[in-house]
């Protein structure tokens, strides 16, 4: 399956493997999602499938979104996401996407927004070391110099400094699905995923299979 699925992070727990070792897992309520739009190379310039997730009350959705969803005959959905495909004609408008489309042992990439930490200093935000704490030093948690002198005469873009921490989109790659509960639309994934409980997650088949890695800025 080339499509992904949208879900909601429920929290973390643990499972025990065959050797009796505790394995940290994340519980995700994934889907059911509905296909809300099909795009083709002839009409849109590229082939893609758009899906929707999570019902929403009518008074909380605007008229353009309401009209867009009415074309596909779907209920009012809060979240919409698009996935590129080679041929969108293989999919049916209004069809459901559930956890049944995934398999136990499959590797997936999961994207979400990290927990916001507010304004943070350079030590907490970037893990820099502090200054000396004794011998008359007045530089304990100060950043120190952020540039040179006349050359270059400016601060380079991207300089790691204090600022807002978290709230960024992060993708954790190659996470293994340990268990699937079709009755409750649950995916049990090995390890942790971005975001706090209740946050939206985008789950896609892994682009490359290997050790789990994390991509995204602070």
UniProtKB/Swiss-Prot annotation:
Transmembrane residue ranges: none
Q: Cellular component per GO? A: cytosolic large ribosomal subunit
- Enumerate the InterPro entries for this protein: Ribosomal_uL3, Ribosomal_uL3_bac/org-type, Ribosomal_uL3_CS, Transl_B-barrel_sf
In its keyword annotation, does this UniProt entry include Ribonucleoprotein? yes
**Region entry Disordered: which residue ranges?**
128-167, 199-218
GO terms, molecular function: rRNA binding; structural constituent of ribosome
The UniProt keyword set, sorted, is: Ribonucleoprotein, Ribosomal protein, RNA-binding, rRNA-binding
Taxonomically, the superkingdom here is Bacteria
Asked whether the keyword Transmembrane is assigned, the reply is no
Q: Name one GO biological process term.
A: translation
Q: Which HAMAP family match?
A: Ribosomal_uL3_B
**NCBIfam families membership:** L3_bact
Quaternary structure and interacting proteins, as annotated: Part of the 50S ribosomal subunit. Forms a cluster with proteins L14 and L19.
The family classification in the record reads: Belongs to the universal ribosomal protein uL3 family.
Function description: One of the primary rRNA binding proteins, it binds directly near the 3'-end of the 23S rRNA, where it nucleates assembly of the 50S subunit.
Name-wise, this protein is: Large ribosomal subunit protein uL3
Provide the species name: Prochlorococcus marinus (strain NATL2A)
């Amino acid at each position: 399956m080339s499509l992904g699925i949208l879900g909601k992070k429920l929290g973390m727990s643990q499972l025990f493997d065959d050797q009796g070792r505790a394995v940290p897992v994340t519980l995700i309520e994934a889907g059911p999602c509905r296909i809300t739009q099909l795009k083709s190379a002839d009409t849109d310039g590229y082939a893609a499938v758009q899906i929707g997730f999570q019902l929403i009350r009518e008074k909380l959705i605007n008229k353009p979104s309401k009209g867009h969803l009415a074309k596909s005959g779907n209920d009012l959905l809060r979240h919409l996401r698009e996935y590129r495909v080679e041929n969108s004609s293989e999919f049916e408008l209004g069809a459901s996407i559930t956890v049944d489309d995934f398999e136990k042992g499959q590797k997936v990439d999961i994207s979400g927004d990290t927990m916001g930490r507010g304004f943070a200093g350079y030590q907490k935000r970037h893990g820099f070391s502090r200054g000396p704490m004794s011998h008359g030093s007045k530089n304990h948690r100060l950043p120190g110099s952020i540039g040179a002198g006349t050359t270059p005469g400016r601060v380079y873009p991207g300089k790691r400094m204090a600022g807002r921490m978290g709230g960024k989109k992060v993708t954790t790659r190659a996470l293994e699905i340990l268990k699937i509960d079709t009755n409750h639309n649950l995916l049990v994934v090995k390890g942790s995923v971005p975001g706090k409980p209740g946050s939206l997650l985008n789950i896609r088949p892994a682009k490359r299979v290997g050790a789990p890695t994390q991509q995204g800025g602070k």
